[in-house]
Amino acid sequence: MTKRIEEKIEGVIESLGYLLYDVSLVKENEHNILRVSLKNPNGAVSLDICQQVSEIISPLLDVCDFIQDAYILEVSSMGLERVLKTPKHFKLSLGEKVEVKLTNKESFQAVLKDANDWSADFELENHAIKSVEYKDLKKVKTLFEW
């Protein structure tokens, strides 16, 4: 269902100059919550941007009726520190510092240099490039340095 929602709202969000990072539908305290997270290629995602996107996609979602039950729409930035789960997440996080944990228990910190549909390239501290297929990644999380 979230894939259908993504397909419906992604073009609208891009027409406003922003990028759709993720869509998730969760249940918290008996409430269905539709979370839409954004990236602003020109800077931060402000509260005004979240409100603008929410006001535009809310009626669109109501008309499409993808979610049968009542839900709460939350629009937010993708966040400074987040787990990368899909090739799209990796592609939208290029150039960011990440902590990588592999399925073989190896871990390292690096800069995410490139990503495609099946693997990601990481620049290590010694400037060597390490290519890893997604199937070999256990967890990749962006790191924000203060």
UniProtKB/Swiss-Prot annotation:
Gene3D superfamilies in alphabetical order: RimP-like superfamily, N-terminal
One Pfam family recorded for the sequence: RimP_N
Major localisation: cytoplasm
A GO biological-process term: ribosomal small subunit assembly
Places the protein is found: Cytoplasm
A GO CC annotation given for this chain: cytosol
SUPFAM superfamilies the record matches: YhbC-like, C-terminal domain (SSF74942), YhbC-like, N-terminal domain (SSF75420)
Keyword annotations: Cytoplasm, Ribosome biogenesis
Family: Belongs to the RimP family.
PANTHER family recorded: RIBOSOME MATURATION FACTOR RIMP (PTHR33867:SF1)
Purpose: Required for maturation of 30S ribosomal subunits.
Protein name in the entry: Ribosome maturation factor RimP
